[in-house]
Amino acid sequence: MNIADGRQAFPAPAKLNLDLRITGRREDGYHNIESIFCLIDLQDTVYLKSRDDGKIILHNPVDGMPQEADLSYRAASLLQKYARNPAGVEIWLDKKIPTGAGLGGGSSDAATVLLVLNRWWQCGLTQRQLIDSGAALGADVPFFIFGKNAFARGIGDRLDEMDIPKQWYVIVKPPVHVSTAKIFTHEGLTRNSASSIMPTFQNLQPFRNDMQAVVFKEYPEVWKAYSELSRYGFALMTGSGACVFTACQDRNSAYNIYRQVSDLYEAYLAEGLSKHPWLSV
């Protein structure tokens, strides 16, 4: 969508980890995972405006964060070396995805910047090259570039499309920010889950999140939110938290739960997507 001042709007959807297992620690300090990634229609909007002077300007960085540290800024900077002509861009972020929530908002914004600028700047990078580049920005970025619901391996950069039944989700965000680094370095974290032999949506049930127990111990607020949501059905934490969610087969069922929990917590009602909205642009 074009805006009067020349900006164009692009979607950046959130994700849920419907299952997340840690299968080992790598020599470089990172962890190998296996996870089901599902796109949802809760999304940020990334506004971009091209410049021809080589400057990258992020107009509304997160409070207290220099623009050079923002993933969207870093994504644009990363692509500049591949641009055919001196290329710049102005970036505005309309944030609807809560931060520090395990929903991948910052990573999705960065992936959208990579996808758009790869086209605008005629960088010519393949999807695989974009995924490899995006992995340097964050573990969730490759999934958003892949653009379809997926089973992820490695550090999240080995992706296979997975068919996920259409579902609605009620997402609850407790009033706490979870430190991903703290959880991944915790001595109590499970790091030896068995790798899946035939990973399908059905075969991986019952779903789990290997980080959940540690997060509950270190952040009681997440446990409280999980306990409340569990009253209505099977609940699970996404990513390293802090959000927890439950799935429903139809919107009415999800909305009834949402009405109850939204009186107690910041809550979201979201529909599952089969592909990134960018694929329809």
UniProtKB/Swiss-Prot annotation:
List of catalytic residues: 15, 140
Function comment: Catalyzes the phosphorylation of the position 2 hydroxy group of 4-diphosphocytidyl-2C-methyl-D-erythritol.
Cystine residue pairs: none
Keyword RNA-binding set for record: no
Lineage: Bacteria, Pseudomonadati, Pseudomonadota, Betaproteobacteria, Neisseriales
NCBIfam families membership: ispE (TIGR00154)
EC annotation from Swiss-Prot or TrEMBL: 2.7.1.148
Protein name, UniProt field: 4-diphosphocytidyl-2-C-methyl-D-erythritol kinase
